[in-house]
Every structure is written in C-alpha cells, then in structure tokens.
Amino acid sequence: MSLKGKKIGILIEGDYYEPEIWYYKHRFAEEDAELHFLSRMWGQTSAVMAAGFKGHEYKIPFDGYVESFEGMDDATLRSFAAIIVPAGMVSDRLRYTEDIDKLPPATEFLKRAFAEKSILKGIICHGMWLAAPAPELVRGRKVVVHNNLVGDARNMGAIYTNQDVVVDGDLVTGRTGGHCHQFARKIIDILSGVDKQK
C-alpha cells in the first residue's frame, strides 16, 4: 500500500507530544506520503517558529520545516488528502485569538478543511480543543477524545464513542497521543483505499 502523491498536513505548535509527532514523521514517510507541518507564524519566519517549538514531555526542540496555514488559498487546501490536529497542547496554543469576537485563525482553517469533504480530518486526544470555538463541526458526529475532554465533546454536541479510534465519514478521531499508531493506521488505510469507511 502506498500514499505516493498524497499530502498530509499536521498542525504544530509548542508543547507537542514528541512520540506522536516523531511517529507520524516516520510512519507516513514509510507510505511515501508528503508531510507538511502547518502553524500560525505569529509574524515570524518559518525557521524562527520551528526553532521555538518545544515538546511537551521532554522539551525537545521541533525538528522540521514549518509552513503557514494563514492565507492558504482554496486550491492549496484542496491539495491535501488529510489534515491532522495532534495531541498535546498544540490545539490549546493555536486556538488563541486576539479578538475574542472572532474565531481563532487555526479554527477558521479547520472550518475550511471541514467544508472540503475530499479532505480527511484527523483529530486526536486534546486536539478536539481546536474545534471547541466551532462546535457545529462535530455536532451529531461520533468521536472519541481523551477522558479529560469527554464532557467538552458532549457539550459540543458530539456523540462520544468509547473506542480507541472512531471514524465518522471524513472525520477520524483518536483517544490519546498514545494511540497515535492506531490513529495513523486508520488514516493510512482510508487514504489508500483499504478501508472504505470514508
């Protein structure tokens, strides 16, 4: 099975969960996927941003190139086969907004991805925080989240499903960063056509 020619975008910020991100870097590469780490630049260059990202568990600097999702045009967005919101504190940092009457830029980006049914959306563990400002994205959909976020998911109108990985159409959710291997496997299976759940 191969994901050659498929682009996968992973949102990234400080306090990422190192084992999860390292796993994705290697596992998706094994399937020949083109991996892109996407973030809000906060007015900085890619090199400055990447150098400033530290992991959650071991405080290890991020080792990768970071691209901006801000201002991404529709054609570029549609070129992605999947967009993943990882575990750790990534989503909490990305959901910051200077204007509390507007959606955070990262949530706006997630809304745009949800509007494109051709894009597989993956949200794992605390990644669900990024959808909290736009609960309509998951309302009425089956999801799994970290145990600490079950109340949040239910308050967003999602249908909590007690499984390690849950698929609801073009949405794949995972319980914790520790389940990243099962989560990635499901995404690979769907994108490669092995799993027809989407």
Give the residues covered by each predicted segment.
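Glycine/proline-rich loop-helix segments at beta-alpha junctions forming the active-site rim
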Residues: 146-148
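A short beta-strand/loop micro-motif in the catalytic core of glycosyltransferases
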Residues: 121-122, 143
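Extended, subdomain-level signal for the structured scaffold at the beginning of enzyme domains
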Residues: 1-118, 129-139, 150-198
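Short, thiol/selenol-centered motifs that function as redox-active sites or metal-ligating centers
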Residues: 123-127
